[in-house]
UniProtKB/Swiss-Prot annotation:
Cellular localization per UniProt: Cell membrane
Keyword Transmembrane found: yes
Lineage: Bacteria, Bacillati, Actinomycetota, Actinomycetes, Mycobacteriales
Membrane topology value: Multi-pass membrane protein
Originating organism: Mycobacterium tuberculosis (strain ATCC 25618 / H37Rv)
Pfam families cross-referenced by the UniProt entry: BPD_transp_1
Transmembrane segments: 11-31, 57-77, 90-110, 127-147, 176-196, 234-254
Matches recorded under SUPFAM superfamilies: MetI-like
Protein's name in the database: Molybdenum transport system permease protein ModB
Length: 264
């Protein structure tokens, strides 16, 4: 590969302005934190309950994203049918939908009178405004992140090896477990981390579809929203906690995908 050419100097000015624009609000949060009380603010019973619920539901939604997203990414990447190509925008739509719209859509799908929810309700299964609703809301908004991060790798990774394995007599299931999945594993890990981070910070769809019941559906973003009115210092401290978690996630993903690495 040829080394990149030097950029014009004027390019650095808007680049620096963009960096400052992104960094300034984060720095403002750190400055605003009541540091002597920081640990006490993030370890109150309500904060701990919300954090634990967020981690549990984000982990559950990440598992769902992997179970659903890996096959979806493979189908999108490998299938050449028109139907699959036409479904791609639909699958990625939650990326651009306002989260509150996603929450309303889930409510009318899985709510008591929803398209599917009415039958579940008749069977004694209630999803809306429960912990399961939190998991579904997080999965709805996070699934496209895993799919889109894995689709590119699924399109090229291991195709030649799969053909060789098949010509040697390996069954499709064996090819999947022994060839395809190991080659996709780095992408699955990166996509899972992104999905977990997105689930951890989900707010709008959760509030609309699951509500804000303490210990049941009140995740950390909802706790921050409520504390913003009753205890602004606690809201700032919890916000910084989420910023740190998100930063660790971004650094972790960046460490797994070094710049200039050829992933083919």
């Amino acid at each position: 590969m040829h080394p990149p050419t030097d950029l014009p100097r004027w390019v650095y000015l808007p680049a620096i302005a963009g960096i400052v624009f992104v960094a300034m609000p984060l720095v403002a949060i750190a400055i605003r934190v009541d540091w002597p009380r920081f640990w006490a603010l993030i370890t109150t019973p309500s904060s701990q309950t919300a954090l634990l619920l967020s981690v549990k539901t984000a982990a559950a939604s990440t598992v769902l994203c992997v179970l659903l997203g890996v096959p979806m990414a493979l189908v999108l990447a490998r299938s050449r049918g028109r139907l699959v190509r036409s479904l791609r925008p639909l699958i990625l739509l939650p990326l651009v939908l306002p989260p509150v719209v996603g929450g309303i859509a889930l409510l009318y799908a899985f709510g008591r009178l929803g398209l599917i929810g009415r039958y579940l309700e008749a069977a004694g299964i209630s999803i809306a405004f429960s912990t399961a609703a939190v998991v579904l809301a997080q999965t709805f908004v996070s699934l496209p992140y895993l799919v889109i991060s894995l689709e590119g790798a699924a399109r090229t990774a291991g195709a030649d090896y799969e053909v060789v394995a098949a010509t040697l007599g390996a069954r499709p299931g064996t090819v999947w477990w022994r060839v395809t999945l190991p080659l996709l594993l780095p992408g699955v890990v990166s996509g899972s981390v992104l999905a977990f981070a997105r689930s951890l910070g989900e707010f709008g769809a959760t509030l609309t579809f699951a509500g804000s019941r303490q210990g049941v559906t009140r995740t950390l973003p909802l706790e921050i929203y409520l504390q913003r009115v009753t205890d602004p210092d606690a809201a700032v401290a919890l916000s910084l906690l989420l910023v740190v978690v998100a930063a660790l996630v971004v650094l972790g993903v960046g460490a797994r995908t070094p710049i200039g690495t050829d992933t083919r």
